[in-house]
């Protein structure tokens, strides 16, 4: 049986390491016909050269999850690390074809192929396209007819891989395919309940990676996966990693209901809750299922900016959502994205007025300044029209949009002024807690028996520092 080595490139550990769920799902799709091994840079003693030498792969897949941290001020690009730490060593260690994939790759396929001197790549979902690519190479066929396959200077006739049937995908089973120890203490086990997004946010690259239609897994399948993982790992937290958890309406409710029906005792959290779809009944179901916290990503609380960003909810709906989660005592992290098209000081102050009036002071508010420009988005079209970028210019290396009505310096000045008086508001450039703060938080949680979300413990420390 031929061998495939799948290499993860996300080695960031702050604020906590992120497990390579995408690689594990591709591995599951490959395993019936291939001998597969995953290299996880977060594993103890991870040694790429030793793994390549011992495994002697026939093909190597390099997963590229992120391009950068999408932080305008003091942000970090991952391009050089991916190339120097993974792609170049792989080229030196093995003659096996190097194939790129992942969300970060799919946004900039030709740029990454050139940077990494790779042979092929898969744009979009890899569970079907990657095995098809390998089969074509084994048979000596040209793989460029496979949707989503790209090579330096060449692309298939269909840019992205055909969307897979998510209800037929095998479970990722991360803990069976890699050492889960690095993720157990701070991270949460990732669960994906659907793919695709039907929303039209101006800046977002999700639809071009996963498609513009929701493809939902049956609630029973989602909860089967949770139950199986809990049976293997015991007391482990789970995080739903969909772009938005409660879209489309009814899907999140069905999952929560299924968890409750089975009597599972689990700890849950989720990356995104859409204010357009929040009801008291949903939050009650989520609390009953085991949610200890949620995230909400409205991006703005200005009616003008909600329209400019093409959000699918109104200020009134956002206010109602904030009222519902506060009355339900559901800990919530809020995320706002300031500086988009048409942003002014007045619209920024509208967002902070919402924070003051509706957000629980015990909840953390994450403020991002400027918006990362990605190709093939409405924001890209605006950026070209306003001469932020030139048509066809590569955006692999970080470029950010800031409303011309403000400018970068004025935006940073306003946000700095407003966050300085609000201890629960954290700028994106300051959002990763330093190691000493994380250690202090861990000490407090242990000594005081705190069973609150970590962000609330960190806020306790921030308040103490600001008043000291």
Predicted regions mapped to residue ranges:
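Radical SAM enzyme core and accessory elements
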Residues: 2-7, 35, 49-58, 95, ...
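Short helix-capping segments at alpha-helix termini
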Residues: 91-95, 140-142, 260-266, 328, ...
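Non-cysteine beta-strand/loop elements that form the S-adenosyl-L-methionine
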Residues: 62-64, 126, 282-301, 364-372
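Flexible glycine/acidic-rich beta-alpha junction loops that bind and position SAM and/or redox cofactors
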Residues: 13-14, 66-70, 110, 199, ...
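Catalytic cores of alpha/beta
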Residues: 109-115, 342-356
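Acidic, low-complexity intrinsically disordered segments
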Residues: 2-227, 231-234
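Radical SAM [4Fe-4S] cluster-binding motif and immediate context
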Residues: 170-333, 338, 353
């Amino acid at each position: 049986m031929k061998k495939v080595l799948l290499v993860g490139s996300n080695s960031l550990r702050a604020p906590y390491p992120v497990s390579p769920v995408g690689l594990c799902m591709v591995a599951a799709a490959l395993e019936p016909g291939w001998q597969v091994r995953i290299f996880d840079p977060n594993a103890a003693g991870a040694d790429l050269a030793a793994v390549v030498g011992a495994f002697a792969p026939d093909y190597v897949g390099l997963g590229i999850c992120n391009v950068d941290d999408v932080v305008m001020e003091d942000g970090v690009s991952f391009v050089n690390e991916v190339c120097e730490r993974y792609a170049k060593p792989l080229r030196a260690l093995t003659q096996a074809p190097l194939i790129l994939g992942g969300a970060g790759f799919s946004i900039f396929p030709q740029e990454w192929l050139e940077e990494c001197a790779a042979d092929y790549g898969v744009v979009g979902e890899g569970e079907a396209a990657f095995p098809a690519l390998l089969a074509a190479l084994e048979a000596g066929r040209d793989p460029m007819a496979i949707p989503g396959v790209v090579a330096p200077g060449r692309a298939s006739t269909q840019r992205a891989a055909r969307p897979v049937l998510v209800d037929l995908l095998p479970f990722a089973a991360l803990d069976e395919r890699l050492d889960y120890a690095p993720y157990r203490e701070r991270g949460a086990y990732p669960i994906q309940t659907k793919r695709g997004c039907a929303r039209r946010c101006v800046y977002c690259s999700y639809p071009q990676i996963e498609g513009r239609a929701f493809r939902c897994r049956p609630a029973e399948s989602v909860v089967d996966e949770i139950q199986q993982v809990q049976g293997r790992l015991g007391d482990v937290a789970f995080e739903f990693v969909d772009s938005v958890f409660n879209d489309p309406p009814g899907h999140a409710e069905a999952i929560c209901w299924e968890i409750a029906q089975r009597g599972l005792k689990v700890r849950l959290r989720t990356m995104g809750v859409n204010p357009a779809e929040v009801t008291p009944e949903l939050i009650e179901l989520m609390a009953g299922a085991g949610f200890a916290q949620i995230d909400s990503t409205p991006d703005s609380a200005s009616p003008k900016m909600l329209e400019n960003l093409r959000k699918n909810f109104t200020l009134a709906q956002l206010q109602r959502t904030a009222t519902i989660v506060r009355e339900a005592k559901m800990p919530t992290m809020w995320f706002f994205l300031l500086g988009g098209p048409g942003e002014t000081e007045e619209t920024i102050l509208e967002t902070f007025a919402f924070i003051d009036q509706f957000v629980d002071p015990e909840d953390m508010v994450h403020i991002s300044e400027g918006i990362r420009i990605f190709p093939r988005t409405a924001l890209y079209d605006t950026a070209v029209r306003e001469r932020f970028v030139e048509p066809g210019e590569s955006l692999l290396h970080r470029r950010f949009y800031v409303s011309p009505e403000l400018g970068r310096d004025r935006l940073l000045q306003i946000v700095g002024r407003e966050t300085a008086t609000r201890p629960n508001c954290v700028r994106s450039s300051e959002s990763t807690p330093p190691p000493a703060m994380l250690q202090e938080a861990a000490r407090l949680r242990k000594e005081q028996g705190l069973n609150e979300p970590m962000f609330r413990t960190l806020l306790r420390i921030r308040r103490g520092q600001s008043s000291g």
